[in-house]
């Protein structure tokens, strides 16, 4: 398909073939980067990063990706420094920014904000997270990380742990994993279970899904444990948050019954859900996961800008 000008809003907009193509392009770009250090595919192109919510990894990896493609970056990391503070609408902000740039990356607390931005923009829009809804580029780098670690995705048993109700990373990832022959363990407190419509869809698509609150019972079965923090900022009230705060911690004691080959992932930032003692074990994959953001986002930027010649 023609990727030039395409928006990246939801993992639901991707076929399995789309996903595999992005992963293949990312691998090619990673190899080129290792050989050359930097590339010039996007020379003369400008990325605008519009971050209405805090971000470290997503924003910086998109900026790094664009610079490594030879392009440049403008943008903001807080809405408080923009005319949004004066009451400017999101639509007007997008229409303004597109006059200065060739592609937009947006993170916003409102579900559907990225879709709205794509509807009004005449240039590609990439969703870097819209509320508790979707985070498609995180999902693609997660799949890339798993594939690099295991050489495959099919046949794996994957556990998603923590805040499955509000965590946009696990919503997107679960939907993407439905394209593959995997078993999914959804491990969470009762209050933070995966939304029913997502679980129902996974089962309709033939995924074996097991819901449980028992991490220690599930961990011996897992090839991948994908840990998420409790999304404090998404809770309607503090009392509900305090009920589930600190529900799980992955530590050496928990991992003693894990497979030798288990990999622990986390979209980060972490709070206390993975003990630092895990960092030095063979199980820790979360910092390699951070690195994966660069080639995957290079692939998405290059494809939507139409500069890669593929």
Curated annotation (Swiss-Prot):
Catalysed reaction, written as an equation: carbamoyl phosphate + L-aspartate = N-carbamoyl-L-aspartate + phosphate + H(+)
Pfam families: OTCace, OTCace_N
Binding site for L-aspartate: 86, 168, 229
Record GO cellular component, one term: cytoplasm
Record: residues binding carbamoyl phosphate: 57-58, 107, 135, 138, 268-269
PROSITE patterns, sorted: CARBAMOYLTRANSFERASE
Subunit-structure text: Heterooligomer of catalytic and regulatory chains.
UniProt xrefs under HAMAP family: Asp_carb_tr (MF_00001)
Name of this chain's protein: Aspartate carbamoyltransferase catalytic subunit
Natural source organism: Thermococcus kodakarensis (strain ATCC BAA-918 / JCM 12380 / KOD1)
């Amino acid at each position: 398909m023609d990727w030039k000008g395409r928006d990246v809003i939801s993992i639901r907009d991707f076929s399995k073939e789309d996903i595999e193509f992005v992963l293949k392009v990312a691998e090619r770009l990673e190899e080129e980067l290792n050989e050359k250090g930097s590339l010039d595919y996007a020379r003369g192109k400008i990325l605008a990063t519009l971050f209405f919510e805090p971000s470290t990894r997503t924003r910086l990896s998109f900026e790094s990706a664009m610079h490594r493609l030879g392009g440049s970056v403008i943008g903001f990391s807080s809405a408080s420094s923009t005319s949004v503070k004066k009451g400017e609408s999101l639509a007007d902000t997008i229409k303004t920014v597109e006059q200065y740039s060739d592609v937009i990356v947006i993170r916003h607390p409102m579900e559907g904000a990225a879709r709205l931005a794509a509807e009004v923009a005449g240039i590609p829009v990439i969703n870097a997270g819209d509320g508790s809804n979707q985070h498609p580029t995180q999902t693609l780098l997660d799949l890339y990380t798993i594939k690099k670690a295991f050489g495959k995705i099919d046949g794996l048993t994957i556990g998603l742990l923590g805040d499955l109700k509000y965590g946009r990373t696990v919503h997107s990832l679960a939907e993407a994993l439905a394209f593959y022959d995997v078993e999914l363990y959804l491990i969470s407190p009762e209050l933070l279970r995966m939304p029913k419509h997502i679980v129902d869809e996974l089962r309709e698509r033939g995924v074996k899904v097991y819901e449980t609150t028992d991490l220690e019972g599930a961990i011996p079965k897992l090839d991948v444990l994908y840990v998420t923090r409790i999304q404090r900022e998404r809770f309607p009230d503090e009392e509900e948050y305090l009920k589930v705060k600190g529900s799980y911690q992955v530590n050496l004691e928990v991992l003693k019954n894990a497979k030798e080959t288990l990999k622990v992932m986390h979209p980060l930032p972490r709070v206390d859900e993975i003990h630092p003692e895990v960092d030095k074990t063979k199980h820790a994959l979360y910092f390699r996961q951070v690195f994966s953001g660069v080639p995957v986002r290079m692939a998405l930027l290059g494809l939507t800008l139409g500069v890669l010649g593929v």
